[in-house]
């Protein structure tokens, strides 16, 4: 099995705080891998460490066979890694079209990818001239995911896509992630275990900055002890 991403024993500090104290994970090509754990476990910091936003001080991060830790964020992104942050980083005063265009790495990316993107997110085509701030929370999340697809990324890091959304909208977001996984490998941080269990093939659990368990999602669903110990209320 080939792995698009391999993270090995990374340690990351934010200021004087030792946030990640030995996180390892593997993301197989073509998979949806869920990064699970309680609030504050280090999941978002792991994504930011992969991207170089909070560079690790120790350990290795390998993308498509090449080590990328220590590289600048824009160099890492240019290799084909897209990021959808937790708080839907869209420009509220710009139109949907302008939000998409600003995500281009090369001139014409949106034109080349438009059919693919609007097949996944037909509502965005209908709303193309509306300001981002006029969209519903679910539509803004779709736009945030679509922005990460404007360049031809092979790995998408998606942070808490269901955060703050109504159940009916969560279903729409889940369907979008399912569809895009046919075109890109996904590393998903998701606090909603039901959503993660229905989407992901594999999982890694982080507890207090350390990876503590990894495996197939189908087995985790029936592992009540692991769910209670690492994913239940603290």
What residue ranges belong to the model's regions?
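Conserved structural motif at the start of ABC-family nucleotide-binding domains
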Residues: 5-7, 20
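Helix-to-loop junction immediately C-terminal to a conserved catalytic motif
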Residues: 51
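ABC ATPase NBD coupling module
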Residues: 55, 67-88, 114, 126-129, ...
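ABC ATPase signature
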Residues: 94, 135, 148-149
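Conserved ABC ATPase signature
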Residues: 131-135, 139
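A short, proline-enriched helix->beta-strand linker immediately N-terminal to the Walker B motif
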Residues: 149-154, 183
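Helical segment within the ABC ATPase nucleotide-binding domain
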Residues: 170-183
């Amino acid at each position: 099995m080939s792995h698009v991403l391999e993270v090995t024993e990374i340690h990351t500090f934010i200021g004087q705080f030792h946030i990640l104290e030995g996180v390892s994970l593997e993301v197989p090509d073509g998979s949806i891998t869920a990064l699970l754990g309680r609030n504050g476990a280090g999941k978002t910091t792991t994504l930011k460490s992969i991207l170089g936003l909070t560079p690790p001080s120790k350990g290795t991060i390998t993308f498509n066979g090449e080590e990328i830790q220590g590289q600048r964020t824009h160099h890492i992104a240019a290799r084909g890694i897209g990021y959808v942050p937790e708080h839907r980083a869209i420009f509220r005063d710009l139109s949907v079209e302008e939000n998409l265009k600003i995500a281009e790495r090369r001139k014409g990316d949106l034109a080349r990818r438009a059919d693919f993107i609007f097949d996944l997110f037909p509502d965005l085509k209908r709303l193309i001239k509306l300001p981002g701030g006029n969209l519903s929370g679910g539509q803004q999340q779709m736009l945030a995911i679509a922005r990460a697809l404007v360049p031809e990324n092979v790995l998408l890091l998606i942070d808490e896509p269901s955060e703050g959304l109504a159940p009916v909208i969560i279903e729409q977001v889940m369907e979008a992630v399912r569809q895009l996984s046919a075109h890109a490998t996904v590393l998903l941080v998701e606090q909603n275990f039901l959503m993660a269990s229905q989407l992901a093939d594999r999982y890694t659990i982080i507890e207090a900055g350390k990876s503590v368990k990894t495996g197939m999602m189908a087995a985790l669903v029936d592992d009540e002890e692991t769910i209670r110990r690492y994913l239940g209320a603290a």
